[in-house]
Structures are given as C-alpha cells and as structure tokens.
C-alpha cells in the first residue's frame, strides 16, 4: 500500500486474503485504487471480492479468462510512463514484460525504489516472453534505475533478500545475452 496526501494505491491484492478491504481501511482512510503488477492469481486473487476496479497493463488481458475468471469488476488499463498522482507522492508506471506479457513495475522516484511484482527479484525466472523481450525489459529498467537513482526494486514474493539491486538487473542482461549467444548453456 502506497499512500499519498489524498489517495492510496494498493499494488497487487494477493490471494485468499480474507476481508482485504477492511485490512486496507485499517491502514488508510483515503480512497484506494488497486493496480496489479500482472494478472496471476497470487497477485490479483483477492481483488475478486473486494475491489470494483483493477488497473492492469493491457497486454495482460489475455490472461484474464484463465487467471481472473470470476472477477466481475471493471478492468481499467494503465499506460507505459503514466504518472499516478497520490497527492504529494507519485508512482510512475513502467511496463516490464517478462514474467507475463503485461508485467508492470511501479516506481516511486522520490523514495528511490520500485515495486516489481515478479519481473525482478522473485526468486526464479518464469518467462512469459522470449529472451530478447526480457533483455529489452532489463535494459529499459536499468535505464530507469540509472535516471532516477533507484536503490531497490521490491518483488512480489519473498525468496532470500526480498529486494533487487541495480547490479542484479544488469546481471540479468548479461545472463540473457549469454544464453541467446550460446555462450552459456544448460
């Protein structure tokens, strides 16, 4: 949950969280918008019962029938580079396809961190796209990290240190390029 002066944004709803709306209301009394890093049920499952709208990358609409079949709310679309203004605090929407075609990272430039869902740092690399797309995504995110001096990306799961550093994103570029070139196999 990211809170500004006038609004709050919940990044991912998790799954099987009973009374998520009440839990969020116990933290903030501001209006809350739900955004998803991607549409897998471990990130959107609790949205079904508690949120009338969810904002996603339009590239992930292909996954709605499989991963969100019971969601009856309104699906709204984010745009790459969009600024979500919470009043005194903003998040930038950065499309980061890789884990899914519509994976998205939300960057808080002022705080120098981002929320990457399963795009970076979630402990394993389950690709929903090809390696060339992953390389493009990593290069794009690396440029955003450098431009805004982002210190960490916080992933959607806890496996180990639970944050991704700029160097590890660069390492993903090298690893992916080495796999594509045949330098690394296995």
How would you describe each model-predicted region?
Residues 7-10, 15-16, 90-180:
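Metallo-beta-lactamase
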Residues 15-86, 178:
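Active-site HxH/HxHxD metal-binding segment of metal-dependent hydrolases
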Residues 1-7, 17, 26, 48, ...:
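Zn-dependent metallo-beta-lactamase
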Residues 1, 9-10, 33-35:
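Short, conserved beta-strand segments within well-ordered enzyme catalytic domains
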Residues 1, 22-25, 43-45, 104, ...:
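Short, flexible, glycine/charge-rich loop motifs used to bind or transfer phosphoryl groups or to couple energy/partner
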Residues 1, 83-85, 105-107:
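Residue-level detector of beta-strand face positions
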């Amino acid at each position: 949950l990211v809170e500004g002066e006038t609004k709050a944004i919940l990044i991912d709803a998790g799954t099987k969280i009973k009374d998520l709306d009440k839990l969020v209301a116990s933290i903030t009394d501001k209006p809350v918008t739900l955004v998803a890093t991607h549409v897998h049920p471990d990130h959107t499952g609790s949205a079904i019962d508690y949120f009338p709208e969810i904002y996603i990358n339009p590239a992930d609409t292909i996954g709605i029938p499989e991963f969100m079949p019971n969601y009856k709310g309104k699906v709204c679309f984010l745009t790459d580079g969009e600024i979500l203004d919470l009043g005194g605090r903003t998040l930038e929407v950065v499309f980061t396809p890789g884990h899914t075609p519509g994976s998205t990272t939300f960057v808080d430039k002022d705080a120098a961190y981002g929320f990457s869902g399963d795009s970076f740092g979630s402990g394993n690399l389950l690709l929903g796209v090809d390696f060339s797309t992953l390389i493009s995504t990593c290069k794009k995110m690396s440029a955003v990290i450098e431009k805004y001096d982002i210190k960490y990306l916080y992933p959607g799961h806890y496996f180990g240190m639970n944050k991704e550093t700029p160097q590890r994103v660069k390492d993903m570029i090298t690893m992916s390029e080495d796999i594509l070139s045949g330098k690394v196999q296995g």
